[in-house]
Amino acid sequence: MSVKWEKQEGNEGVLTVEVDADTFKTALDDAFKKVVKQVSIPGFRKGKVPRGLFEQRFGVEALYQDALDILLPVEYPKAVEEAGIEPVDRPEIDVEKIEKGESLIFTAKVTVKPEVKLGDYKGLGIEKDDTAVTDEDVQNELKALQERQAELVVKEEGAVENGDTVVLDFEGFVDGEAFEGGKAENYSLEVGSGSFIPGFEEQLTGLEAGAEKDVEVTFPEEYHAEELAGKPAVFKVKIHEIKAKELPELNDEFAKDIDEEVETLAELTEKTKKRLEEAKENEADAKLREELVLKASENAEADVPQAMIDTELDRMLKEFEQRLQMQGMNLELYTQFSGQDENALKEQMKEDAAKRVKSNLTLEAIAQAENLEVTDEEVEAELTKMAEAYNMPVENIKQAIGSTDAMKEDLKVRKAIDFLVENR
């Protein structure tokens, strides 16, 4: 095999590959063995047609495509390795010369990973946020725990207040006409939750059980139902019942109900403080790492290929789908509800995708510049951590992953971020 790499404009180039005649002959032989199984010629059983007769009847050209299908998946990666390039998308392959008894020549137009010119990435001067937890933070968290344990109690008298839950009937009208999805009976709504159209919930405050009211609102311009977006509407509302939150008393009994590992409110308070400190520490660490990576990336120069952005967009969309599934939704339902199709979602994600790709390229370049390497022991430690997380034997994890090359790259990128933190 002979390989020639010609760099063109931007990150594109052409790989010219010549495969020797013997290798091409072997591919033609294998192609014939495959094709002949499907060929019937009078006087011969299927699969038993002689090669000479086959080529006489159909021409050797009938084997070329199958030979290429056998050859290219093997020879193209070899050529890429020999040329020392890193393609980031599928190649556009053209066959320049194909003839029995001769060498095969093909070209592959590819987009390769760009070179990164690093700017400043040490001494960036970014400080970690303060992680101190105040008594007020702890009290607010305990109050939130109280809120989550609150019971709804029917108000025998009095009007709707912010935070109350009302049971109501409503029917909406636009231009005097009822619209689909605008009617409900005995609907429970927490006033102040922001669940309804802006302005709706505020107009319920001050009403008493049994009250009826015309609530006038305007649908937001970006409302998911286009036929309603930006239009004024009137909702005829009837209040059946008002429920107020009744908070449990903040005492030792409350503490034991919340956490069976504590006996007193003082213990719960201390445990809550430690949990908040840990959460703040993790949040500050994550923010610091993110800001350092972003700054180093902004200081670097790289012509990011669209192919890499498109790949990242696809990955981000899959991540988004997985999050939706965890919430009991899917992408189709989401697009119906939000009024956005897949292309609109990708358009929203495009800027973040480009930043992610450039950040990753920058971190790879930093790892190379600082000679950061990942040892076999570090890979084993990561595999062990995964095995513990999934409660599986390490060998099963290894079989599922196959090659650890991607894991090594991820660990190397992580080391580059650690380097930024240590040298900020």
Swiss-Prot record:
GO terms for cellular component: cytoplasm. One of its GO terms (biological process) is protein unfolding. Its EC number is 5.2.1.8. PANTHER family: TRIGGER FACTOR CHAPERONE AND PEPTIDYL-PROLYL CIS/TRANS ISOMERASE (PTHR30560), TRIGGER FACTOR-LIKE PROTEIN TIG, CHLOROPLASTIC (PTHR30560:SF3). HAMAP family: Trigger_factor_Tig (MF_00303). The keyword Cell division applies. InterPro entries: PPIase_dom_sf, PPIase_FKBP_dom, Trig_fac, Trigger_fac_C, Trigger_fac_C_sf, Trigger_fac_ribosome-bd_bac, Trigger_fac_ribosome-bd_sf, Trigger_fact/SurA_dom_sf. Involved in protein export. Acts as a chaperone by maintaining the newly synthesized protein in an open conformation. Functions as a peptidyl-prolyl cis-trans isomerase. It comes from Bacillus velezensis (strain DSM 23117 / BGSC 10A6 / LMG 26770 / FZB42). Keywords: Cell cycle, Cell division, Chaperone, Cytoplasm, Isomerase, Rotamase. The gene is tig. GO terms for molecular function: peptidyl-prolyl cis-trans isomerase activity; protein folding chaperone; ribosome binding. It catalyses: [protein]-peptidylproline (omega=180) = [protein]-peptidylproline (omega=0). Belongs to the FKBP-type PPIase family. Tig subfamily. This is Trigger factor. Signal peptide: none annotated. Gene3D superfamilies: 3.10.50.40, Trigger factor ribosome-binding domain, Trigger factor, C-terminal domain. Residues 163-248 form the PPIase FKBP-type domain. It is found in: Cytoplasm. It is an enzyme of class 5 (isomerase). NCBIfam families: tig. PROSITE patterns: FKBP_PPIASE (PS50059). Consists of 3 domains; the N-terminus binds the ribosome, the middle domain has PPIase activity, while the C-terminus has intrinsic chaperone activity on its own.
